[in-house]
């Protein structure tokens, strides 16, 4: 094991506690004062913008603060008891401070659930009685998460009312309108079990406290959100000790390995962390049943349903069980496009890209309450239906999903197919410009680093349609739809031939990023062709050269495959899609290397990812990290400034990498599990328990 002291953490200045739709984001001291992205958020709405405990108007000194798990947190704070003599300054070896020798302790315990519960415990560890005012500063603004970013202006103009109700409830009520839309949200902070009566004055809840030596004082605060404009989001406290996914945690596959000096303990740590993170990102309000659920894409920015993200995460994590695939497929089927609505980039059959519940989306300042601007989601949906079939062989479970899968393919053929390939463009005034795998505004550049404007047919989108047709044809054959199965099978073969002819660049030994509006190759060297390997669209004679190009120095950082070649003028190791490294991509690429028997490439990619995981707190890979070269000057990668962590598809990438190393693939319709392990020396042994096929 490494004795390195490197421990990386995204968002190093913010502490997060989260469960479901609720996120508590504080400064490093456990409090917050209305700063950027800090507060208690429920459904992307900042219900509490200021929260700070004081003793006689003075701050507490934090001495130990930590998450207990993703949904709970505890902090220790101390001060010298008010009125106590600080005494002489200590100059001995202990360098003792007065507040550590005569201590008034504040212990805060928080659990996030449907809302928040905070338990407040005071203990007088001094040898004299003390009297003081304990107070907490409270503020609320009901800002959308996006409005809390530094430099962002507030768009919604609502009415906020505040009221105090005896014996101890502080209520905030907020209403806003925009066009025909309106929201009605609120928060009650209820004081329970208080050791002395509360008082509300000048933005503070205060208590008069008297403590004898060794005595304690307690109160509990329940934060009860009200989101009346959303169905199923009502008033409820945080539920102490509630596990968001108990059945999954009991039944999901688990992993172990003997202790050794190899990477094996890191692999196990990363696997078990990923397993927990996926459960912690669960969105209970979207549950389709105890064994059928989906998750948010990532914390803190993506606590929402993102179609392609959760489709990817659910199939990559299939080794854990089918619950996520089942719940995700059903949740998206319920939200499949039905009409032509250019504002939302919606068309019949198109699969949802994202669904937000914050004020700006619900009020219609943007189309994100239900937005369809992704080509990838519709291509992925049939693939994941097929994966669910391969893992379960359950006709009753899969058959209702066939219709939505076919409609998603028909959408691609009707709205995205052009001249034999599949492209994208937005029709919305606030739509996503790039709607393929890489969807940031500057993601698509040519070999000179110049932006390319849609319509664009990217290489990976052709691969996704290919594998969707191929896998769905097999499933339709099983279901007796043989004519449609034959049609899709032949279409897949024809697309593969056209793709290899049109996208291959012989002089580069690689595939073009895409075809532009004039169907000219976009000749930039990117990670996108790695997805083509994963999907199996690459002709056999081109596989070795394609894989080798991904591992040349300009593409391989030493921690993973970069999104864009470092030789491209637009390369930036910090850019979202122009030079960074994404664990989710490298997880998919691993299955591509396995598909073509490239075990050396698989081992290299896997080792790099787990060596990266070793550098991060809890072995938790973030959404994306920088593409700096791994060398003596760069002993660890930087982190993309806005990276989510945990991120669903970074967690699933870890599971996917191990599945590839184990050579596991299920075929439940034939009651078959294929196992062809190629474990490297850094992972000599691995035990999987509870695998369900």
Language-model features and meaning:
Residues 119-131, 384-398, 405-411:
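Hydrophobic or amphipathic alpha-helical targeting/insertion segments
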Residues 314, 378, 382-385, 462, ...:
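TPR repeat positional signature
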Residues 97-109, 159, 197, 348-379, ...:
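Aromatic/His-enriched, Gly/Pro-containing loop or helix-boundary segments
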Residues 388-400, 471-487, 593-600:
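Inter-helical turn/loop segments and adjacent helix faces that build the functional surface
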Residues 79-83, 208, 261-305, 329-371, ...:
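Extended glycan-interaction surfaces of carbohydrate-active proteins
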Residues 1-279, 291-293, 297, 301-304, ...:
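Terminal accessory carbohydrate-recognition/targeting modules of carbohydrate-active enzymes
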Residues 309-340, 528-540, 586-602, 606-609:
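Alpha-helical support elements that line or immediately flank enzyme active sites
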């Amino acid at each position: 094991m490494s004795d390195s002291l490197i421990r990386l953490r995204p968002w190093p200045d913010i502490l997060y506690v989260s469960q479901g739709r609720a996120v508590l984001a504080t400064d490093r001291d456990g409090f917050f004062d209305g700063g950027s992205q800090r507060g208690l958020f429920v459904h992307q709405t900042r219900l509490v913008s200021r929260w700070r405990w004081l003793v006689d108007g003075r701050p507490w000194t934090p001495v130990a603060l930590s998450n207990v798990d993703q949904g709970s947190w505890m902090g220790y704070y101390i001060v010298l008891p008010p009125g106590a003599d600080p005494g002489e300054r200590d100059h001995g070896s202990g360098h003792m401070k007065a507040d550590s020798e005569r201590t008034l302790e504040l212990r805060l315990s928080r659990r996030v659930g449907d809302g928040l519960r905070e338990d407040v415990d005071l203990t007088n560890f001094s040898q004299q009685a003390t009297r003081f005012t304990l107070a907490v500063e409270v503020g609320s603004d009901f800002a959308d998460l996006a409005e809390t970013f530094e430099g962002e202006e507030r768009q919604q103009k609502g009415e906020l009312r505040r009221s105090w109700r005896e014996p101890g409830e502080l209520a905030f009520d907020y209403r806003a309108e925009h066009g025909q839309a309106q929201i009605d949200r609120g928060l009650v902070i209820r004081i329970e079990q208080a050791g002395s009566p509360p008082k509300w004055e000048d933005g503070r809840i205060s208590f008069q406290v008297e403590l004898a030596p060794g005595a304690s004082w307690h109160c509990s605060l329940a934060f009860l959100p009200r989101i009346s404009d959303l169905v199923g989001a009502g008033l409820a406290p945080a539920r102490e000790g509630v596990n968001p996914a108990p059945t999954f945690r009991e039944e999901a596959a688990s992993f172990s390995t003997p202790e050794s000096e190899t990477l094996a303990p890191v692999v196990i740590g990363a696997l078990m962390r990923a397993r927990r993170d996926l459960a912690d990102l669960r969105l209970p309000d979207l549950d389709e049943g105890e064994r059928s659920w989906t998750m948010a894409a990532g914390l803190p920015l993506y606590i929402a349903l993102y179609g392609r993200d959760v489709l990817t995460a659910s199939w990559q994590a299939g080794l854990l069980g089918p619950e996520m695939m089942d719940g995700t497929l059903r949740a998206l089927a319920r939200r499949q496009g039905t009409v032509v609505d250019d504002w939302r980039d919606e068309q019949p059959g198109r699969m949802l890209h994202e669904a937000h519940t914050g004020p700006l989306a619900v009020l219609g300042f943007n189309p994100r309450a239900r937005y369809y601007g992704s080509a990838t989601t519709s291509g992925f949906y049939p693939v994941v239906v097929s994966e669910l079939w391969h893992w379960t062989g359950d006709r009753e479970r899969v058959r209702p999903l066939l219709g939505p899968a076919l409609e998603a393919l028909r959408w691609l053929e009707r709205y995205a197919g052009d001249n034999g390939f599949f492209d994208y463009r937005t029709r919305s005034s606030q739509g996503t410009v790039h709607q393929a795998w890489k969807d940031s505004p500057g993601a698509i550049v040519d070999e000179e680093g110049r932006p390319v404007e849609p319509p664009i047919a990217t290489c990976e989108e052709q691969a996704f349609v290919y594998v969707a047709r191929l896998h769905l044809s097999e499933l339709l054959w099983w279901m007796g739809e043989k004519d449609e199965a034959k049609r899709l099978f032949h279409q897949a073969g024809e697309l593969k031939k056209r793709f290899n002819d049109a996208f291959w660049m012989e002089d580069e030994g690689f595939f073009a990023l895409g075809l532009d509006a004039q169907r000219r190759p976009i000749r930039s060297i990117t990670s996108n062709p790695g997805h083509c390997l994963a999907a199996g669209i690459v002709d056999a004679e081109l596989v070795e050269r394609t894989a080798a190009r991904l591992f040349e120095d300009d593409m391989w950082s030493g921690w993973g495959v970069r999104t864009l070649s470092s030789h491209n003028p637009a390369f930036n190791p910090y850019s979202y899609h122009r030079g960074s490294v994404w664990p989710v991509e490298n997880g998919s690429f691993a299955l591509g290397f396995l598909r073509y028997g490239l075990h050396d490439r698989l081992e290299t990619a896997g080792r790099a990812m787990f060596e990266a995981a070793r550098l991060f707190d809890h072995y938790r890979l973030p959404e994306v990290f920088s593409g700096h070269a791994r060398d003596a000057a760069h002993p660890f990668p930087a982190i993309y400034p806005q990276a989510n962590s945990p991120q669903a598809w970074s967690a699933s990438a870890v599971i996917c990498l191990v599945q590839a190393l184990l050579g596991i693939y299920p075929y439940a319709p034939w009651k078959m599990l294929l196992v062809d392990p190629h474990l490297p020396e850094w992972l000599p042994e691995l035990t999987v328990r509870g695998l369900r096929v």
